[in-house]
């Protein structure tokens, strides 16, 4: 039996020329594909087994971490005025719990989310009332005030680690105040948490390394589409010299790149873990991509944490 590609099926079914189809953005091509081939839509798939893990301090962390921007109402949809309302309506309490449960079923054992009341309440209910086991790495929430006090609240609600928000770190380094970052991460540790530094700019990591700050880990943006990130080649080259574990985030440019290619790229550039915001219907396939590519082996120069 001759196999017809999805692109070929589109051309035959909709009468679209290859040239026109090739000119469409990935999102539009994916949408058109669903119009003529919905064989996978809503299908229940077997959970992924054997998702790989690494170490962050004394904790075993899945190489794929489920992010929290979507459940906090942020999809980085730029000028779309309705996106926050759409996200918060979609991710009601039950949908949040369903998504976290799917993550656990597929081997993801860690989530990365803001340290704010919305997350405090949901995470505590999930772990205490629903039996959830996800570990939580917190992101400091600037609007909550002093980051060290924010860390203490995150700790009290179950976080194992916290990192300083990337925009805050970026600004401190730009202003020549890297020592302020050092003071804050020292406070994080005194609160009993692993302490990380977030960065959207490579210069932030470079400034922290030059100042000989000693975080437990870095959070660094890296992607193929230059979205809130320094050039990926430069990030990858510098991070070879950084001994601390680092978590890549915005690895798909907030949904602007394809999962398989974006994940592979981040790992090849040296990320030890990737944090990815996922809808419930993306969890299983994203996990399968990561498990398969790591099982096959990733071509990278940097040793794994």
Task: Locate the predicted segments by residue.
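N-terminal secretory signal peptides and thylakoid transit peptides that target proteins
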Residues: 1-17
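C-terminal segment of N-terminal export signals and the immediately downstream linker at the start
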Residues: 24-62, 298-299
């Amino acid at each position: 039996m001759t196999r017809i590609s999805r692109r070929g099926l589109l051309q035959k079914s909709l009468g679209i020329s290859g040239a026109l189809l090739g000119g469409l953005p990935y999102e539009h091509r994916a949408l058109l594909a669903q119009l003529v081939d919905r064989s996978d839509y809503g299908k229940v798939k077997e959970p992924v087994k054997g998702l790989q893990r690494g170490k962050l301090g004394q904790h075993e962390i899945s190489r794929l971490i489920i992010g929290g921007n979507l459940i906090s109402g942020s999809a980085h949809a730029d000028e779309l005025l309705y996106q926050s309302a759409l996200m918060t309506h979609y991710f009601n309490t039950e949908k949040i719990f369903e998504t976290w449960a799917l993550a656990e079923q597929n081997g993801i054992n860690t989530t990365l989310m803001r340290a704010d009341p919305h997350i405090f309440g949901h995470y505590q209910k999930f772990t205490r009332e629903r039996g959830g086991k996800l570990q939580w790495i917190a992101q400091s929430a600037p609007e909550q005030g002093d980051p060290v006090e924010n860390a203490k609240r995150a700790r009290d609600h179950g976080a194992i680690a916290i990192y300083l928000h990337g925009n805050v770190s970026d600004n401190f380094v730009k202003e020549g105040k890297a020592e302020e970052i050092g003071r804050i991460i020292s406070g994080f540790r005194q609160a009993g948490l692993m302490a990380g530094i977030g960065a959207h700019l490579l210069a932030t990591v470079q400034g922290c390394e030059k100042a000989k700050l000693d975080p437990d880990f870095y959070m660094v943006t890296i992607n193929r589409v230059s979205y809130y990130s320094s050039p990926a080649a430069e990030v990858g080259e510098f991070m070879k010299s950084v001994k601390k574990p680092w978590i890549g985030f915005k690895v798909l440019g907030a949904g602007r790149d394809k999962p398989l290619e974006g994940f592979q790229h981040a790992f090849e550039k040296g990320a030890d873990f990737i944090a990815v915001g996922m809808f419930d219907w993306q969890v299983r396939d994203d996990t399968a991509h990561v498990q398969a590519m790591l099982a096959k082996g990733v071509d990278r120069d940097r040793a794994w944490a």
